Every structure is written in C-alpha cells, then in structure tokens.
Amino acid sequence: MGTQHRIKVDVPDRVLYTVGSCVLVIGSIGITGNLLVLYAFYSNKRLRTPANYFIMNLAASDFLMSATQAPICFLNSMHTEWILGDIGCNFYVFCGALFGITSMMTLLAISVDRYCVITKPLQSIKRSSKKRSCIIIAFVWLYSLGWSVCPLFGWSSYIPEGLMISCTWDYVSYSPANRSYTMMLCCFVFFIPLIIIFHCYLFMFLAIRSTGRNVQKLGSTYNRKSNVSQSVKSEWKLAKIAFVAIVVFVLSWSPYACVTLIAWAGYAKTLNPYSKSVPAVIAKASAIYNPIIYAIIHPRYRRTIRSAVPCLRFLIRISPSDLSTSSVNESSFRASMSSRHSFAARNKSSCVSSISAAETTWSDMELEPVEAARKKQQPHRSRSFSKQAEEETGLLLKTQSCNVLTGEKVAVSSISLHDPFERSFGENAPELLLRPSCLRTSSLPFGLNSSSTEENADTSDMEVQEQHQMEASSH
C-alpha cells in the first residue's frame, strides 16, 4: 500500500462527520434488523424449512457486513482519515468482500431454488432437504472466500478509497492484475448471477401464468382447483418476496459496479472522492433492506417479532386477515407440493378419480354378507384403495376351498365386477386393481372359510352314501 493513498482528502471535516454518522446509523439498523430476522426464524419452528435456510444465511451475512463495516468506517471518519494501517485495511475489505459476495450468491441460490420449486415441483420434492441446503450454503461461503482472498495473494490489492475513511480493492490502478481482477469480479459475482436470477424469474412467471390457465380450464373437472390455486399463489408470493429483496440489492450495488467499470475503462481521473465513497456507502447499506422487506411482507415474521419484542408493536402492525387465517406465504415451499404434484401429473390424477368412482361401484355390487361385514370393519371410506386390497387379499388367503355352487357365484360376481373396473381405468390402470384375485376376494362370503367348507364336504359325503344305500336296497 503506497503512501499516496494515505493523503488526507481536502474536504470539510463536517462532511466526514456526517458520512460517518450516517454509516453508524445504517450499521445499527442492519445489526438490529438482521438479528431480529435470525431470532424469528430460529425461534419459530415453522419457519425453519430448507428454503428458509437461505434466508437465514442472507441475514447472517448482512449482519456480519454491518457489524464489521460500520464501526470501522465511523471510527476513521471521526479522525478524518484512515488510521488502522495496512492490516486494518485488509481486514476491512476482506470482510466487506466476503459478506457482500455471500449475500449476492445467496440471492442467486434463492432464485434457483424458487425456480426449481415452481417449474419442476416433482424433482424438487425429491431433492429438498436441510442437508442439501446446508451444502449449498457451504459452497456459497467457499466461493465468496475464494474471491476475497485473491488480493491478499497478489491478484490486485486492497487500498483506501474516496474520502479515505474506508477501503476497497484497487480498481483505480491501470495494471493488468488490477484490471483482470476487476473484470472477473464484476462478471462472476455481479453480472452473470444477475442474468441467471432474471432468467429464473422470467421462466417462473411464465410457469405461473401457464399453470393458472390450466387450472381455469380444468376447474370444472377437478375438485382440487382451490388447492392448486392456493399452492400456486403461495409459491408465487414467496418468490415475489425474494424478488423484491434481489431488486433492492441490485439497485444498491449497481452504482458501485458502475464506478469500478468507469475506472476499469481508463477514466479514473473523472471520479472525485465523493463519487467513489457515496456508492460504497449505498452498497453496504443493502444489509438493512431485507429485515424491512420481511417486516412489511411476511406475516409470520411480523407475528413472531411482535410477540418477542413488545416495544416494536407500534411499528409492526398485523392486519385482521393475518390473525384470522394463515397467510399464503406462511407454509413451507415444499408443503404445498402435494397439490402441485397432482396437478402436474393430471393424467394420473384422472386415474385416481376413477379409482374413487370404481370404489363406490364396487361397494354397491358386493354381496350382502360382505357388505354387512365391511360396514363394521370400514367405518370410513377415506382409507386408501391399496389398504382395502390388502385386507381383502388377506381374506382370500384364509379361504382354502369351496363347493361347486359357491364357486359359480364367485365366478359370476368376479366377471360382473371386472367389466366396470376395466372400463373405468383403461390401459393405464394399476395392475393390482385388475387382478382377478382381488375382485374375487371382495365377493367371497365371510362364512366361506375352511371350517365351513369341511362341514359342507362332510355333509355331501353323507348324502352320497345314503343315496348309494337306497339304490342298493331298491335293487
């Protein structure tokens, strides 16, 4: 770090005091707000979902950003120059770069997660887990760490900037190392993630619009219309919250990115101390926006904070609708996937509907002994068809033999039941439902067990013997 960077800037001291005071206020709000976000998501178990782990990570990085940047900047502004030397400058910029890049990459992870949940719900159900979220978060931190330590090992360097009360990487010097680092950092930390984020939200919007149209078309056929609509609204509501946070973050860092690109293009002399320091302050103020966004939009977060911090009740208000009903964005991103699953596989849903209809037909066509016993054993029709089939298969295993007359009745019953099932399900029906053994099981009288069969067999043998005796006596 050269001595030319330690020259005191020729600006009034009151300007430095004002900037330092603003930074301190911003940092205090960021520390308090993000601590409240972390407390809300930690204390409320319903908020601790795999998707919300990314929000907690974002709050953690914003908290650390405010805690490390604001006090140091305020201290130097009170002395009207940088007083912490090279080590303090390296620490200041390293922390700012690490936590700032982590916030950007976390927003990217949130966007990709929302994209997968809304456009590929079936795959997201299988992949969703807290362990997976933690692995992604660990990768985000390692990625940010890699970019932050590069200037410490010679690829660019950390120097004081602007009003000389803060530090940044050297984007002013026109050296190959500084220019390459500045361009790579802007591309892989800002512009490329930004393109991916807007790509995700574009396709999310198209998927939501397409799903809404399909729900309207299928509303007369499916009684799950309200569930699917609620699921779609829930997913889109949560995606909009993340989108607002992303837009605010991008707007905060865009001026700083523009300043670095101007210097990278060779026009560093056109930048004055104010044009260098003010964008940096705006960028680091992005740490305070997320708590405000969640306090305004997220009802469960508001309720948690109100109950934990009574003194904030006059600032955080809850509408009657939030108190009476659960908001659409309270549920987990994955909790509503069951209705999304049924809608995404609507061809299979029609088969499930056919199962329900066929189940009613089956109960109407059963023999009276079976129907009477079934009413005792199955008080509710809400049990799954597969469970009923298992019970009926167990009944079939108890049956070992039957007489000719009963066998004919069973055969007739199975034939009469096979036709409506085949018409209802078609070729795509589950194999279990078309299995003749399952159909015959439902038609077997409960008295047709092994003991009754043996009694019938003994009675038949006695009748045959008596008939032979009568024939012998007549002869």
UniProtKB/Swiss-Prot annotation:
Bilayer topology term: Multi-pass membrane protein
InterPro entries linked to this entry: GPCR_opsins, GPCR_Rhodpsn, GPCR_Rhodpsn_7TM, Opsin, Retinal_BS
Residues with N6-(retinylidene)lysine modification: 284
Tissue specificity statement from the Swiss-Prot or TrEMBL entry: Highest level in the lateral eye. Low level in the brain.
Renumbered residue ranges of the record's region Disordered: 370-390, 445-475
Compositional bias of kind Polar residues: 445-454
Extracellular topological segments: 1-21, 75-90, 156-187, 262-276
Keywords associated with the record: Cell membrane, Chromophore, Disulfide bond, G-protein coupled receptor, Glycoprotein, Membrane, Photoreceptor protein, Receptor, Retinal protein, Sensory transduction, Transducer, Transmembrane, Transmembrane helix
Disulfide bonds, paired cysteine numbers: 89-167
Bias (Basic residues) ranges: 375-384
Name of the molecule in the record: Melanopsin
Function per UniProt: Photoreceptor implicated in non-image-forming responses to light. May be able to isomerize covalently bound all-trans retinal back to 11-cis retinal.
UniProt topological domain (Cytoplasmic) ranges: 43-53, 112-134, 209-240, 298-475
Transmembrane intervals: 22-42, 54-74, 91-111, 135-155, 188-208, 241-261, 277-297
Biased amino acid composition, Acidic residues: 455-464
Glycosylation sites: 178
Record has Coiled coil as a keyword: no
Family: Belongs to the G-protein coupled receptor 1 family. Opsin subfamily.
Basic and acidic residues bias locations: 465-475
CC per GO annotation: plasma membrane
Gene Ontology terms: biological process: phototransduction; visual perception
Compartment(s): Cell membrane
Gene Ontology MF terms: G protein-coupled receptor activity; photoreceptor activity
Taxonomic path: Eukaryota, Metazoa, Chordata, Craniata, Vertebrata
Pfam families in UniProt: 7tm_1 (PF00001)
Record has Cytoplasm as a keyword: no
SUPFAM superfamilies tied to this protein: Family A G protein-coupled receptor-like
